[in-house]
Amino acid sequence: MQKEDFVDRVTIFVKAGDGGNGAVSFRREKYVPKGGPDGGDGGDGGFVILRANPGLSTLLNFKYQRRFIAQNGQHGKGKKQSGKSGEDLVIDVPVGTIVKDANTGEVLADLDRSWMMVCVARGGKGGRGNIHFATSVFRAPRIAEKGDKGEERWLELELKLLADAGLIGFPNVGKSSLISAMSNARPKIADYPFTTLVPNLGVVKIDENSEFVLADIPGLIERASEGAGLGNLFLRHIERCSVLVHVIDISGSEGRDFIKDYDVIVQELCKYNEQLSRKPQIIVANKIDLLEKDELEKRLETLEKHANQKIYPVSALLRINIDILKQKIFEIVGKSRLLLQKQPVPVFEKPKPIRTKIEERFDFEIKKTQDGFEICGEQIDKWLSRYSLEQKDALERFLDTLERNGLSEKLKQMGAHDGDTVWIGQYSFEYKE
């Protein structure tokens, strides 16, 4: 995979569909001259859902499209016909994608299972038609609800690759050669630092029925946890690995001290995330073909005592001991998979559409302006978003509600006089004592 094709962090905008408006309608049939209300409800707005697709390995698609908007619900019609709900917008992301609210940083989901889904924006509830407002004394209501607005938000998507095992170590210790020797991956290999600029994934076959995914992480250097070199751009990709394969150039062919290299990488892992240092590690001494037998045994013994664990000597170039290493990695990966299988797979439950709660009793603010008075408040905004004041009955209901909450008395206290203009949203009214 080329550097420009690997994208592992993006910010996108999502908006769910708005609910459709309810209808004001009455039966109009030949032999029913005074038919009752039959206005249908508006359809619900479509939801925005993210889905983990195992066929994807990068967030590259989001580099070119960053705005995603679901369908609105259709408006209700006469004859009790409800509007069609908007279709949900399902957006595929790679398995291993972490979803965050871009404004708050809150983690909304960790899509670490194939086909796992999460709703990131709920559609608005469709408004009710006038059929719902009929009573024994209010038989011809000319009032219906507007649909609720769908949710909208900015999201940050962060990809953490889902590999079973991750190769870590300094640049030029032979990680790319090792993944090439062990798997079907064919990374670029050269004798200069940072040949690997993006993580490479390879499938390692054990037999016809057994395999695991191995990731070659770009070389780490001292202060990588602080951003040095390729730094922590890629350190997060090993957080999900079951086992870390720490590759060391035992030959010192690059003039490096293999003991110091081991210590630096261990320290950088601990600085970045202490949990990484607790993961199972396999220490691989690569390039054994460049040393004489006696010198090799001496260095392996020194490293084993220092690390206090078994060392696996290999030559990626000559494929020496590669099968032994593959079996050891698979042994640890298999144990991790058994633990994962015992965990229940999350079941996606679609939430209910957004429904704004409107209160009958509420406070509001009155502001004195150059041309009159302005009525404002959270519940005022909610009423205006729910009802169209151009509908006669909706207007009367709204004004009656304001009156019950002390509108006239408060205006009088503010010094209002006959003929003053009172603004409520985009609507203006004439004040009368």
From Swiss-Prot:
Stretches assigned to the Obg domain: 4-162
Keyword Transmembrane helix appears in the UniProt entry: no
Keywords: Cytoplasm, GTP-binding, Hydrolase, Magnesium, Metal-binding, Nucleotide-binding
Cofactor(s) essential for the protein: Mg(2+)
Residues covered by the OCT domain: 356-433
Database matches in InterPro entries: G_OBG, GTP-bd, GTP-bd_Obg/CgtA, GTP-bd_prot_GTP1/OBG_C_sf, GTP1_OBG_dom, GTP1_OBG_dom_sf, OBG_GTPase, OCT_dom
Disulfide bonds: none
Subcellular location: Cytoplasm
Predominant place of localization: cytoplasm
GO biological process: ribosome biogenesis
Oligomeric and partner information: Monomer.
Function as written in the Swiss-Prot or TrEMBL entry: An essential GTPase which binds GTP, GDP and possibly (p)ppGpp with moderate affinity, with high nucleotide exchange rates and a fairly low GTP hydrolysis rate. Plays a role in control of the cell cycle, stress response, ribosome biogenesis and in those bacteria that undergo differentiation, in morphogenesis control.
Name of the protein described by the UniProt record: GTPase Obg
Species the sequence originates in: Pseudothermotoga lettingae (strain ATCC BAA-301 / DSM 14385 / NBRC 107922 / TMO) (Thermotoga lettingae)
Source taxonomy: Bacteria, Thermotogati, Thermotogota, Thermotogae, Thermotogales
Gene: obg
